[in-house]
Design a protein with these regions (language model features):
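Short alpha-helical packing/oligomerization segments
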Residues: 18-44
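Aromatic sugar-binding surface patches on proteins
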Residues: 170-194
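Transmembrane alpha-helices and immediately adjacent membrane-cytoplasm interface residues
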Residues: 46-57, 68-89
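Membrane-associated alpha-helix detector
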Residues: 1-23
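Short beta-strand elements
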Residues: 95-96, 130-133, 190, 196-197, ...
Length: 237
């Protein structure tokens, strides 16, 4: 048992401190290699343990040994690949995007990255919000965001660390009538940002967001694309 535990822990530590520092991003080899090494459990036992003992092992013993190896590798990998020893999880948005409730909006929906706004008037004034989330330090996450219409950028929303966007943070905190409530930034550690997009006509607007941070052992990156679809559903007299 101890041989298997030591072997599983050694594989986890070897991958974390020897293999991963030379990589730029997660790869299938991080999971495939340990699973392939399961085939070495039996030969290693037969080499180290005297044959008079190893020959007594049944198929059930070997199965339990392999299971213990996989469990040990997973447990140690989780410990050495997460804070405070490492950070391999990319930053993200806490709850996608949301808009401030305002006059002229008849109904809204949020599904699969598409925010649909149905109007009872020709145009609508849109204030959009989002919240940056990270498992270590959301403030230091570098965020680049822009809004596009028909393939052309109409405004750059963000370019810098989350904490550097003080005006956007103040605007987010000043709004208490988000359409989806507090789901856009439910945790106190989330960094809320908001922008006044101005008066928008019906159509589809694309929000492109890139977030990066210096993790350990590589740079963590998230790229998100959302759509704001505005439609006039009420016929005006």
């Amino acid at each position: 048992m101890w041989l298997v535990i030591i072997y599983g822990a050694s594989v986890a530590l070897g991958i974390r401190y020897l293999l991963m520092p030379g990589m730029d991003e997660p790869s299938a080899i991080l999971y495939l290699l340990p699973l392939l090494l399961c085939a070495t459990i039996i030969p290693i036992h037969k080499i180290i343990i005297p044959s008079k003992y190893s020959e007594l092992y049944t198929n059930g013993n070997w199965f339990r040994a392999i299971f213990l190896f996989v469990f040990t590798w997973l447990a140690f990998s989780f410990i050495v690949s997460n804070p405070p020893l490492a950070d391999i999880a990319p930053p993200t948005l806490a709850g996608g995007i949301d808009i401030e409730q305002t006059e002229g909006i008849e109904e809204t929906s949020w599904k699969n990255g598409v925010y649909t706004i149905n109007l009872n008037q020709d145009t609508v004034d849109v204030v959009m919000g989002m919240a940056v989330r990270d498992n270590v330090d959301a403030e230091s996450v570098n965020i680049i965001a822009a809004i596009y219409y028909r393939g052309e950028m109409i405004e750059e929303l963000a370019n810098g660390t989350a904490i550097s966007h003080t005006e956007e943070m103040e605007m987010f905190d000043s709004i208490n009538n988000w359409t989806r409530g507090d789901r856009v930034g439910p945790h106190g550690s989330d960094i809320g940002l908001a922008w006044d997009l101005g008066t928008l006509d019906p159509g589809e607007y694309t929000i492109e967001i890139t977030m990066t941070e210096q993790g350990s052992p590589w740079v963590n990156t998230t790229e998100l694309i959302y759509t704001i679809s505005i439609a006039q559903t009420t016929v005006l007299a």
